[in-house]
């Protein structure tokens, strides 16, 4: 079972991962060269 330290690390990692994913998605969607398809 997870203790508080493991849970905190996992939540922090998941938050950073989602944040990076959203930023990357935004850059791909905002880049004009991808809109021509």
Swiss-Prot record:
Residues annotated as signal peptide: none
Membrane recorded as keyword: yes
Domain of life of the organism encoding this protein: Eukaryota
Keyword entries, A-Z: Endoplasmic reticulum, Membrane, Signal-anchor, Transmembrane, Transmembrane helix
One GO cellular component term: endoplasmic reticulum membrane
Membrane topology field: Single-pass type III membrane protein
Compartment list: Endoplasmic reticulum membrane
Record bears the keyword NADP: no
Lumenal topological intervals: 1-8
Topological domain spans for side Cytoplasmic: 30-37
Assigned protein family: Belongs to the OST4 family.
Role of this protein: Subunit of the oligosaccharyl transferase (OST) complex that catalyzes the initial transfer of a defined glycan (Glc(3)Man(9)GlcNAc(2) in eukaryotes) from the lipid carrier dolichol-pyrophosphate to an asparagine residue within an Asn-X-Ser/Thr consensus motif in nascent polypeptide chains, the first step in protein N-glycosylation. N-glycosylation occurs cotranslationally and the complex associates with the Sec61 complex at the channel-forming translocon complex that mediates protein translocation across the endoplasmic reticulum (ER). All subunits are required for a maximal enzyme activity.
Assembly behavior: Component of the oligosaccharyltransferase (OST) complex.
Protein name in UniProt: Dolichyl-diphosphooligosaccharide--protein glycosyltransferase subunit 4A
Gene: OST4A
């Amino acid at each position: 079972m997870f203790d508080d330290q493991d849970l905190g690390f996992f939540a922090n990692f998941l938050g950073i991962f989602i944040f990076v994913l959203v930023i990357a998605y935004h850059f791909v969607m905002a880049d004009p060269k991808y809109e021509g398809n």
